[in-house]
Structures are given as structure tokens and as C-alpha cells.
């Protein structure tokens, strides 16, 4: 009986953690090329008064896969600057111009803005949140709050 167990001990060589999807793997940072949105492009769109293009430029190239908190903070401040510069009447049109992933990304930045409120940012972010919720639904909030990769 023991001879049979010793000879067929292959089951002990299986690494069960290899198949666990929740296993933490400290991989190399794949987002070294992700420097966040281009601040010059965003500023030029803001100066020209093209707010929707400024929002699109600010949401382009998000630093999701980078571990550098400085890059994430810089991208967050750029997006927050764009969101605050919108007029209340233009918010809904801008949110409607985004696709589903864009609305989810916008929600991530809105919640990041809620983390560190400034002078007038909370009131504007609440307006943005209302319009983004109308466009993306409750699922957008759930996807943001359960996402592992943050902005």
C-alpha cells in the first residue's frame, strides 16, 4: 500500500497557487511608457475653448499600469483642472461624447478627485458624477470601486 503511494506522488508536485486568479504577483511595471496625458495638448485645447477635446486629451493615455504615484497624481490634477473648467451646461454633452470605457475612466478620476477636495472641486465633481452616473449607470460605480488598477 505504501509502495503505491510513494510511486504515485506526482500530485504533490502540483503548485495549486499557480491556478489561483487572486494570487498576488509582483510583476515588472509594464507602464513605464505611460506618462499620463499630454499637458500641453490639454492646455492648448483649454485656451482655444474646445472643452470636449480637452477632456478627450486628458483621458487619453491614463497611467493605470504604472506604479509611480507622482505620475498618477499629475494625471489626476490635469483631469481635475479640465473638469473644473467646464460650465455646468456643457457637462452632459461632454459625458455623452465618451464611450463606456471613457465613462468608467472618468468615474475613476472623479472618485480620485473626491479623495482630496479643493476649493470648488467637490461641487463640480458632484455635477460630473451625476452626469456620468446617468450615462454609465450603477455598473460604472461598481466597476470603479472594484477595479484593482487605479488612476
From Swiss-Prot:
Gene3D superfamilies per record: Actin-related protein 2/3 complex subunit 5
Source domain of life: Eukaryota
A single GO molecular function term of this UniProt record: structural constituent of cytoskeleton
Residues recorded with modification N-acetylserine: 2
InterPro entries: ARPC5 (IPR006789), ARPC5_sf (IPR036743)
Gene Ontology CC terms: actin cytoskeleton; Arp2/3 protein complex; cytoplasm; cytosol; extracellular exosome; extracellular region; ficolin-1-rich granule lumen; focal adhesion
Localisation: Cytoplasm, Cytoskeleton; Cell projection; Nucleus
Post-translational modification: Polyubiquitinated by RNF128 with 'Lys-63'-linked chains, leading to proteasomal degradation.
UniProt record, GO biological process: actin cytoskeleton organization; Arp2/3 complex-mediated actin nucleation; cell migration; regulation of actin filament polymerization
Nucleotide-binding found in the keyword field: no
Region (Disordered): 21-44
Keywords: Acetylation, Actin-binding, Cell projection, Cytoplasm, Cytoskeleton, Disease variant, Nucleus, Ubl conjugation
Bridged cysteine pairs (disulfide): none
Family: Belongs to the ARPC5 family.
Xref: PANTHER family: ARP2/3 COMPLEX 16 KD SUBUNIT P16-ARC
Record disease entry: Immunodeficiency 113 with autoimmunity and autoinflammation: An autosomal recessive immunologic disorder characterized by recurrent and severe infections, early-onset autoimmunity, inflammation, and facial dysmorphism. Features of autoimmunity and autoinflammation include hemolytic anemia, thrombocytopenia, hepatosplenomegaly, leukocytosis, neutrophilia, and elevated acute phase reactants.
General function of this protein: Component of the Arp2/3 complex, a multiprotein complex that mediates actin polymerization upon stimulation by nucleation-promoting factor (NPF). The Arp2/3 complex mediates the formation of branched actin networks in the cytoplasm, providing the force for cell motility. In addition to its role in the cytoplasmic cytoskeleton, the Arp2/3 complex also promotes actin polymerization in the nucleus, thereby regulating gene transcription and repair of damaged DNA.
Subunit organization: Component of the Arp2/3 complex composed of ACTR2/ARP2, ACTR3/ARP3, ARPC1B/p41-ARC, ARPC2/p34-ARC, ARPC3/p21-ARC, ARPC4/p20-ARC and ARPC5/p16-ARC.
Name this polypeptide is given: Actin-related protein 2/3 complex subunit 5
Upper classification of the organism: Eukaryota, Metazoa, Chordata, Craniata, Vertebrata
Encoding gene per record: ARPC5
Amino acid at each position: 500500500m505504501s509502495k503505491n503511494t510513494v510511486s504515485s506522488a506526482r500530485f504533490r508536485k502540483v503548485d495549486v497557487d499557480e491556478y489561483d486568479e487572486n494570487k498576488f504577483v509582483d510583476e515588472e511595471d509594464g507602464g513605464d511608457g505611460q506618462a499620463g496625458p499630454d499637458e500641453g495638448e490639454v492646455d492648448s485645447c483649454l485656451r482655444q475653448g474646445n472643452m470636449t477635446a480637452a477632456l478627450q486629451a486628458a483621458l487619453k493615455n491614463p497611467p493605470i499600469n504604472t506604479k509611480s504615484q507622482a505620475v498618477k497624481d499629475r494625471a489626476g490634477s490635469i483631469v481635475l483642472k479640465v473638469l473644473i473648467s467646464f460650465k455646468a451646461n456643457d457637462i452632459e454633452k461632454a459625458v455623452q461624447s465618451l464611450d463606456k470605457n471613457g465613462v468608467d475612466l472618468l468615474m475613476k478620476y472623479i472618485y480620485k478627485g473626491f479623495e482630496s477636495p479643493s476649493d470648488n472641486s467637490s461641487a463640480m465633481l458632484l455635477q460630473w458624477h451625476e452626469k456620468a452616473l446617468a450615462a454609465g449607470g450603477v455598473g460604472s460605480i461598481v466597476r470603479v470601486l472594484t477595479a484593482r488598477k487605479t488612476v
